[in-house]
Regions:
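Acidic, proline/glycine-rich intrinsically disordered inter-domain spacer in sigma factors
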Residues: 76, 84-110
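Sigma70-family region 2
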Residues: 36-53, 72-74, 158
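DNA-recognition helix of helix-turn-helix
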Residues: 137-162
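Residues within helix-turn-helix
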Residues: 28, 131, 142
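Arg/Lys-rich amphipathic alpha helix in sigma70-family domain 2
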Residues: 46-49, 60-81, 97-98
Length: 173
């Protein structure tokens, strides 16, 4: 059982860290969330390994750990920095402008309420359907659509309605 868990972690750790980084907007917090999740998963690995999609289950555990962390640390200021967005976005003539737009988008994403941020990450980073997001967040598909709609509206409003070099929907793709 231990060897199968070690193989799972070796094959999927980078992907799980990228997912957690997109959720948290903080690479250090992402490492903490993944570490806590994998510790819990290791104790339950016999049951998890028998599931049809163990990686999806562990990803849901990461989502839940992130949501729980946000509840526990509601007043903590989250640093909006993750390397997965470095190379994303429409090329601009001025690299400084590109980085400023990227940083502004990161800050807007980091400021979203936790469930809206999770819904946005699951939709645009993990390419999940409404049903998959609803299952991960423990809500209905209609609520997922509402979370995504509100998040996109908030992101657009925070941008002053301008459609600049980094479109909202490309920030996590």
């Amino acid at each position: 059982v231990r060897d199968r868990f070690d193989d799972f972690v070796a094959q999927r750790l980078d992907r799980l860290l990228r997912y957690a980084t997109a959720l948290t907007c903080d690479p250090h917090l992402a490492q903490d969330v993944v570490q806590e999740t994998l510790l819990r998963a290791q104790h339950r690995w016999e049951r998890i390994a028998g599931l049809q999609a163990p990686e999806s289950y562990v990803r849901k555990m990461i989502t839940n750990e992130f949501l729980s962390w946000r509840r526990r640390k509601a007043s903590r200021n989250v640093t909006a920095a993750h390397s997965t967005l470095d190379a994303i976005g429409t090329p601009t003539a001025d690299h400084a402008e590109h980085y400023a737009e990227r940083d502004a988008m990161r800050a807007r994403i980091a400021a979203l309420p936790r469930k809206q941020r999770a819904a946005i990450v699951l939709r645009f980073y993990e390419d999940c359907t409404d049903a998959e997001i609803a299952e991960a967040l423990g809500c209905s598909a209609g609520t997922v659509r509402s979370h995504i709609s509100r998040a996109l509206s908030t992101l657009r409003a925070a941008d002053g309605g301008r459609r600049r070099g980094l479109p909202v929907t490309e920030a996590l793709s």
